[in-house]
Design a protein with these regions (language model features):
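Substrate-binding groove/exosite segments of carbohydrate-active enzymes
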Residues: 158-162, 208-334, 340-342
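Terminal accessory carbohydrate-recognition/targeting modules of carbohydrate-active enzymes
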Residues: 1-227, 247, 265, 336-453
Length: 453
């Protein structure tokens, strides 16, 4: 079953919520399921057919709805940092039905001892759930849990565990009422939900983080949502780098840099540099090279010169490919001219440029040329496309494509870094005859019959 991540930018600890609303920490020591006692029986979200899920705010809040008589039971889950500490999930259940029902949270921790008191649930000695409003009933162990559920909301079926590694808590929920618990995703303090940001605050906070990167506007709502969702997930992964191998970290760093999250990418690169490994030398060199090309940060180049040199040596020993031009540019910027000369003499294979996904459709560089919207899709014709602060090797690029009848108009601004020759801009996917060496401008492009529209 598919899962959605629960993580917080820069905070340790993480978890997952599956397609039915089952919540687990990353280590999977326990699982939290939700049930609703309505009418004549309990409905377990993980077993009901009428369950659907959606994401709010690029996936910062996951909403799961379960059909009950006269409406829906709605679960919302989001992750926050607990006072600067580890990630904590807030699990909220609300009644959007016309009649009251009972909500139950069921914790399963195979092989562990569970304990419930007035403030929460512990697995072993570790608190895993906390609440502000105590449940009206709680039980530990298969028999006691079944008796509680039978008494509070009708017949309960589908309990999987037979021992004391099962606990259940029940809250009555009148029409429009909600209850919530906080669930530990790491090791550290576990405040109750009232002491943590609510869903609206989390949505606003993530929007602020997303807006730190390059702004991209595409004439496709589904693609726009996917861009934001991917960005949120990349940023969230910076809080759980210990779960990723070096190649995965390199890919994460490149994606962050491509979308303008350079400070976050630098944090990932610091983690890569600290691992002192010989694995994935090509990927490491690409990540360091992309960061330098897209930021021009000389201090970062100096800081990363040593791990870059080590990765070059590892690549030479292993016969791995090396992205020669980006690495050479980084070494020269770091004042390592001798190392750059040695790189040119090495008998290594040059690395091909891998696919860059959506970014390759928005911008690309070829030598001293910058291609604007090189992958413009025919289905976008007539719709607005824009990018603001898109990182390139020549500096941040902003542009917009607007349509005037059959002709596209292009507005652009390149905040260029000093270079030996002027940068030439072209837009071959829109007008193969157009080019300009001006850093800013606007023009009405001609359409070509050879273009795919």
């Amino acid at each position: 079953m598919s899962t959605r991540p629960l993580d917080v930018l820069g905070a340790p600890g993480w978890g997952e919520v599956d397609a039915r609303g089952l919540v687990q920490p990353g280590a999977k020591e326990w699982a939290l399921d939700w049930w609703v006692g309505a009418s004549d029986r309990w409905r377990r979200a993980s077993q009901e057919a009428a369950v659907r899920q959606s994401e709010l705010g690029a996936g910062a809040v996951v909403e799961t709805r379960m059909k009950v008589p006269d409406g829906d039971a709605v679960q919302r889950v989001w992750a926050v940092a607990a006072g600067g500490g580890p990630a904590v999930a807030v699990v909220q259940v609300g009644n959007e039905a016309a009649t009251a029902f009972a909500a139950a949270l069921v914790v399963e921790a195979p092989g562990a001892a569970l304990a419930v008191d007035r403030t929460g649930v512990a697995v072993g000695a570790k608190p895993v759930l906390a609440w502000d409003r105590a449940p009206v009933g709680a039980a530990v162990g298969h028999g006691a849990v079944k008796a509680l559920l039978d008494a509070e909301g009708g017949t309960a079926t589908g309990l999987d565990h037979k021992g004391r590694d099962l606990a259940a808590m029940v809250w009555p929920l009148p029409h429009t009422a909600r209850m919530a618990v906080s669930a530990s995703l790491g090791r550290g303090a576990l405040p109750p939900p009232a002491d943590l940001p609510d869903a609206d605050a989390v949505l606003r906070g993530w929007q602020v983080h997303l807006e730190r990167g390059a702004r991209i506007e595409v004439p496709d709502d589904a693609l726009a949502r996917r861009i934001d969702r991917n960005r949120r997930r990349w940023l969230g992964r910076t809080g759980r780098m210990e779960t990723a191998d070096v190649a995965e970290l390199c890919e994460l760093s490149v994606r962050l840099d491509h979308h303008g999250y350079h400070d976050d990418a630098a944090v990932v690169l610091d983690e890569i540099a600290a691992r002192w490994t010989t694995e994935a030398p090509t990927e490491r060199l690409r990540a360091f090279g992309v960061h330098h090309d897209l930021t021009g940060d000389q201090q970062a180049a100096i800081r990363f010169a040593e791990p870059v040199a080590e990765a070059v040596e590892a690549a030479a020993r292993m016969g791995a490919e090396v992205p020669l031009a980006p690495v050479e540019r980084l070494l020269i910027a770091a004042g390592q001219d001798r190392a750059a000369q040695d790189l040119r003499r090495l008998d290594v294979r040059p690395a091909a440029t891998p696919s860059e996904g959506l970014r390759a459709e928005l911008v690309a560089d070829q030598g001293e040329e910058l291609l604007v919207a090189p992958g413009y899709r025919p289905v976008w014709r007539g719709g607005p496309l824009a990018a603001y602060g898109l990182p390139t090797r020549f500096g941040p690029l902003s542009y917009a494509v607007r349509w005037h009848g059959p002709n596209p108009a292009l507005l652009w601004e390149l905040d260029g870094r000093p270079g030996p020759v002027p940068v030439s801009l072209r837009a071959p996917a829109l007008d193969r005859s157009w080019s300009s060496d001006q850093p800013t401008g606007e023009t009405l492009l001609a359409t070509s019959r050879s273009l795919p529209w």
